[in-house]
Amino acid sequence: MGKKIAMILGSPDPDSFCRALADRYAESAEQAGNEVRYFRLGEIEFDPVLRHGYNQRQELEPGLKDIQEAFTWSEHVVVVFPVWWGSMPAIMKGMFDRVFLPGYAFKYRENSQFWDKLLAGRSAHVITTMDTPPWYFRLVYRSPAHNQIRRTILEFVGIKPVEMTVLGPVRYASAAKRQTWLDRMSAFARKA
């Protein structure tokens, strides 16, 4: 029996290489018997700004409610995004700000510095692309995008283990290299 996979594409560009990677992963995962709920953030209408922080409730748009329901339903989460300026695209950060709310994804304990991780019991695979050589991003920049998504977002709410796949530099990648990366998506999806 397959897994229940919630999948987020964080690139707003419908013609991006991230889109091709995510499409291949979703298609291969379904062919392998998994159930996939796949969200392309660039196609979902929502305000990515958490207007009042956690001080005032901001109603979730239908697309964000669907994403929240998919996280609840899922056993495995797949997130695909390009690294822009050392981080994730703003639309993806906005989605996490709006969806991973207190009481849903985490809950602060009264009179404590600690919190309950309300999305525990799920694993994740984060797939990123970049034009920077991955070794340079890791050694010189210290992987800020990867630390953010793994430690301060997914693990903060209990999603672990988090597997990371870093592809790059994309800008100079040959057609053969890109095909190799697409084939890796199929292999990852089959073993999800």
Language-model segment annotations:
Residues G2-N34:
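N-terminal beta1-alpha1 ligand-phosphate binding loop
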Residues P12-D13, E43, D131:
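Short, glycine/serine-rich, charged loops/turns that create anion-binding
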Residues Y136-A192:
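Glycine-rich phosphate/pyrophosphate-binding loop and the adjoining helix
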